[in-house]
From Swiss-Prot:
The gene is syrB2. This is L-threonyl-[L-threonyl-carrier protein] 4-chlorinase. Binds 1 Fe(2+) ion. The ability to install nitrogenous functional groups, in particular the azido group, onto aliphatic carbon centers could enable new methods in the field of chemical biology. Its cofactor is Fe(2+). InterPro entries: Chlorin_enz, Phytyl_CoA_dOase-like. SUPFAM superfamilies: Clavaminate synthase-like (SSF51197). Its EC number is 1.14.20.15. It comes from Pseudomonas syringae pv. syringae. The complete trimodular substrate, with carrier protein (SyrB1), covalently attached PPant cofactor, and thioester-appended amino acid, is required for substrate triggering of rapid chloroferryl intermediate formation.
Amino acid sequence: MSKKFALTAEQRASFEKNGFIGPFDAYSPEEMKETWKRTRLRLLDRSAAAYQDLDAISGGTNIANYDRHLDDDFLASHICRPEICDRVESILGPNVLCWRTEFFPKYPGDEGTDWHQADTFANASGKPQIIWPENEEFGGTITVWTAFTDANIANGCLQFIPGTQNSMNYDETKRMTYEPDANNSVVKDGVRRGFFGYDYRQLQIDENWKPDEASAVPMQMKAGQFIIFWSTLMHASYPHSGESQEMRMGFASRYVPSFVHVYPDSDHIEEYGGRISLEKYGAVQVIGDETPEYNRLVTHTTRGKKFEAV
């Protein structure tokens, strides 16, 4: 059966060529701004969050932003929206998991994010977090990045280098050093950049290689819009210039076919200066109903809301 929001043949061809497609509308700007205002306050209550570890919520660690869809009703509905999932199904097929979500705030004066690619997501932890079967040619995850606020060049929108999704410039088996004071806001080719306490250049296969920033395109979006891209696409973000005192907020939901092994042989995640137990973790089946037993699923949030698969 044809899905209402499925990618057209032209959109599919564009995605295969460039590694991204969009932006598309999930909400009106007014609806998103009002919803985010309420959600932001509600998220301050972490009593039902899947990760209660003190290490996860101390300081400004990026890991504290993981997987709030597991306890928040709006985010639980968001990851299952047909506007998103119909298009993801066009790419990944009839059985799909949402295996992670995370917030990406950018405050006035914040640095831009380093150019990077992610395949197994071992980049910060040193241990693969998703593994595709050996007979599959490709890895990575589909990221759906939704603008919860307006995102523009001045406040730090995303940047993509089209067509870079099929070749990795980084080796995720290398290790990066977590040194926030040293690595954040380093000027790289004239732009202040960092990677949440790491320097992503430490993973480069060729230490003399530089991204082709002349080919980069900005992804300016209105609140309520989303973009779809391969995590293996070269992507970064601009610094927040401080011209506005409003933060920029993005929410990333990450999707893989259900046969991809999520968190293999792992009972915790340790990265970005934090550590969290996976005791209450489960991936969410957002499309279809077939998933191998090696992937642990959850059907409801920690507050009892059912995830509605498409």
